[in-house]
Amino acid sequence: TIDXPEDFKHYEVQLPDVKIHYVREGAGPTLLLVEKPEIAIDRIKTAFRKPDNIHGGFNYYRANIRPDAALWTDLDH
């Protein structure tokens, strides 16, 4: 999970081969910028192809890139 200050303006997250940036101006909406989006999309597609992966890998991304995400839940495991 990510612990970011509530008033952050720029925050980076490094996933394998992909860097994700959160950018926010004041109280405005948060922008999500992904370097190498083709790699990020490939990671998601690969997660869908894993046997018995009923959630498609999105729990990993939800828990790891949202700055306001809750901690891991039983569903995430």
Curated annotation (Swiss-Prot):
<comment type="subunit">
    <text>Monomer.</text>
</comment>
<comment type="function">
    <text>This enzyme acts on aliphatic epoxides. Its substrates include epichlorohydrin, epibromohydrin, epoxyoctane and styrene epoxide.</text>
</comment>
<keyword id="KW-0378">Hydrolase</keyword>
<dbReference type="GO" id="GO:0009056">
    <property type="term" value="P:catabolic process"/>
</dbReference>
<keyword id="KW-0058">Aromatic hydrocarbons catabolism</keyword>
<dbReference type="GO" id="GO:0004301">
    <property type="term" value="F:epoxide hydrolase activity"/>
</dbReference>
<protein>
    <recommendedName>
        <fullName>Epoxide hydrolase</fullName>
        <ecNumber>3.3.2.10</ecNumber>
    </recommendedName>
</protein>
